[in-house]
Amino acid sequence: MTTAIQYPSASAKARFVRVSPTKARRVIDLVRGKSVEDALDILRWAPQAASEPVAKVIASAAANAQNNEGLDPSTLVVATVFADEGPTAKRIRPRAQGRAFRIRKRTSHITVIVESRPAKKQGASASAARARRAQASKAASQKEGSE
């Protein structure tokens, strides 16, 4: 049985945000697991309207971590982020011949938990390892071709 490592964390919640939960989840999936700085950069340039409230909540969680918990902002990572469904406001749109269609104005509750994770050790990165493997396979194929 493995135990999860507990990192110091802080959270923020935005409730009753006037954006559909499915649209918020599209944006949330872009930033899950990223550092707070990277997440805010991604959201700043994301074309979706839901990126603005999500960025606000991430910035709020980072500020909570810094002010309330005393954590270093450069080590913060978006550990958990999700959008739950809030109450739906229902409106009526009149249609032809006395009919009426229902408009559903959906809301969501956006929750973000940021954790302060230690910086990774300076080791071989995945791309460097991939480059070494490619070079080794290229050398092996050239060796086979010369024989």
UniProtKB/Swiss-Prot annotation:
The protein's matches in InterPro entries, at most eight in alphabetical order, are given as: Ribosomal_uL22, Ribosomal_uL22_bac/chlpt-type, Ribosomal_uL22_bac/org-type, Ribosomal_uL22_CS, Ribosomal_uL22_sf
- Alphabetically list the UniProt keywords: Ribonucleoprotein, Ribosomal protein, RNA-binding, rRNA-binding
Q: Low complexity compositional bias: what residue ranges?
A: 136-147
Domain of life according to the entry: Bacteria
Q: Name one Pfam family in it.
A: Ribosomal_L22
* Quaternary state and interactors: Part of the 50S ribosomal subunit.
Supply the name of the protein.
Answer: Large ribosomal subunit protein uL22
Organism of provenance: Mycolicibacterium gilvum (strain PYR-GCK) (Mycobacterium gilvum (strain PYR-GCK))
Q: Source organism lineage?
A: Bacteria, Bacillati, Actinomycetota, Actinomycetes, Mycobacteriales
